Amino acid sequence: MKIILTQEVSGLGAPGDIVEVKNGYGRNYLLPQGFAIAWTKGAEKQVTVIKRARSAREIRDLGHANEVKGQLEGLKVALKARAGEGGRLFGSVTAAEIVAAVKAAGGPTLDRRRLELPGHIKSLGSYPVRIKLHPEVTAAFDLSVVQG
């Protein structure tokens, strides 16, 4: 089944991409959740027009993404979390908590969906966190999870 993605789907593509997926995945998940629309010739033409406008906008956004990357690279982010014996957290650190900690540390407002975590953060310590700011720009910073 051919579909056109309307949102970024991990492992599949970016908005505007035309991809081939299995019928069940498209019909039962992507289409009802609003992640994609069914492919037609008219929809494909519309997507090419939108992509052209988006590419012009991305050139401008690339400069902003590099600026945000510069802010994040030198940032020290500390997140206070409750922990038990041995430094094991009660629960785990979420992307939303990391975004709030970056904002509290004086960093820019980030989109939690673009964070790339090294796995589930369930203990105290220092963790590398990456964020995809732009298709061509990825920033990295260290997150310190401390007893709070």
UniProtKB/Swiss-Prot annotation:
Gene3D superfamilies in the cross-refs: Ribosomal protein L9, C-terminal domain, Ribosomal protein L9, N-terminal domain
Q: Name one Pfam family in it.
A: Ribosomal_L9_C
Q: Which GO terms describe its biological process?
A: translation
- GO MF annotation terms: rRNA binding; structural constituent of ribosome
Keyword Nucleotide-binding attached: no
Per its UniProt record, what PROSITE patterns does this chain match?
Answer: RIBOSOMAL_L9 (PS00651)
Claim: Ribonucleoprotein is one of the keywords in the record: yes
Ordered alphabetically, the record's keywords are: Ribonucleoprotein, Ribosomal protein, RNA-binding, rRNA-binding
- One Gene Ontology CC term in the entry: ribosome
Q: Which family does it belong to?
A: Belongs to the bacterial ribosomal protein bL9 family.
Q: What is this protein called?
A: Large ribosomal subunit protein bL9
Q: Which organism is it from?
A: Salinispora tropica (strain ATCC BAA-916 / DSM 44818 / JCM 13857 / NBRC 105044 / CNB-440)
